[in-house]
C-alpha cells in the first residue's frame, strides 16, 4: 500500500526536480524509516523519486551497516530506470554510513548529501555514558563506534569530497545526555561535532536531535540544498 501511495504522489507531483533524481533517506540509530516519512513525502512532492530505507541499526557494526543500508538505497534508486542522479538525506548515524560507504566505494551517480545532526566528530555522550547498564542493548555495536576514542569510526574517516550540507540542532529534550555534551547541543551531539572538513554549507536550527527531520524549516533547508548546493540565505549561520 505504501508503494502505491508513493507512486501516486510521483505521478501527480510537478515540483522543480524531476524523477531522474532519486533521494536515499537513511534514519538514525534505533529508529526506522517511519521517522523519515514526512521528509520523504516533501521530497516526492518536490519531484524526487525516493528510497526510504529500513536497516537493522542495532545489529551490526558501522562498516557492515554501510554496505547493507547504502547498497539497498542505491539499488532501489537504480531500479527506477529514469534515475541519473542519487542524493542522500540522512539523520544521525545514517550520515556516518554514507561517509563509510563513500570511503570504500565509488558512486558515479552521486549528487548531493544533506546530514541532519550527524556525529561527524563522534559524540562525547558515547564515551560518558557507554558504561551505563543497557547502553549496548539500546545502541548495539554501532553505538559503541560513535564516540571520540580510539574505536571512533567517524574520526577515522576523511573529509567530505562530495557536496555536503550539514544541519545541526540546538534544542534538547534529553537533559541527562546534554549534561555531558559541550554547549550548544541537540541532546545527542554537540553542534561543533556535527561539522566536517570539506562541507559545502552548514546551518544551525533550534530543534532537537530526535525530531529535527520532521520540522518544516529543516525540510525546506534540505530541499534547498538538494536543488542548489546551498542553504541559501537561511538564518543560523555562524
Which stretches of residues belong to each language-model region?
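Boundary at the C-terminal end of the N-terminal hydrophobic targeting segment
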Residues: 17-19
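N-terminal signal peptide c-region/cleavage motif recognized by signal peptidases
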Residues: 13-14
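Positively charged n-region of N-terminal signal peptides that target proteins for export
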Residues: 1-3
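Sec-dependent signal peptide hydrophobic core
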Residues: 5-9
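Serine-dependent carboxylesterase/thioesterase catalytic core
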Residues: 21-34, 38, 44-58, 62-161
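Helical cap/lid subdomain of alpha/beta-hydrolase-fold lipid enzymes
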Residues: 103-238
